[in-house]
Amino acid sequence: MRNNKTPFLSAIFTASIRGYQRFFSAFTPSSCRFYPTCSNYALWLLYFESPLSAMGKIAIRILSCNPFCSGGIAYPVTRLKRPSLLQSHKDFNRNFKTITFWLVPTAKSRTTYYIIKV
């Protein structure tokens, strides 16, 4: 389910966001109006989506983070194909990995999911 189409571009964006979190955001007071923070929102989207579509959603999120917005809980939303039960059972037996994200279906459609980090 991870985005593997353009790993180089995703790695560049992810490294720049992690650098921002480590060197700039760590030294400023916490003032984010949303949960998850805009930088975590960006990292989660880059994990699941192509970098270009993720950057569009990230830009909208950053523009909505202003004094006139009330903020709140706003999880990123992504589109994914639901895996078949047989395929996921085969994958489960072969390569078991720890759960990092929950994908919670939205009420809008069967292919859009909220991304929630465990």
From Swiss-Prot:
Q: Which SMART domains match?
A: Haemolytic (SM01234)
Alphabetical list of InterPro entries matching this protein = Membr_insert_effic_factor_YidD
Q: How does it sit in the membrane?
A: Peripheral membrane protein
Give any Pfam family that matches: YidD
Keyword Membrane set for record: yes
The job of this chain, per UniProt, is described as:
Could be involved in insertion of integral membrane proteins into the membrane.
| Stated name of the protein | Putative membrane protein insertion efficiency factor
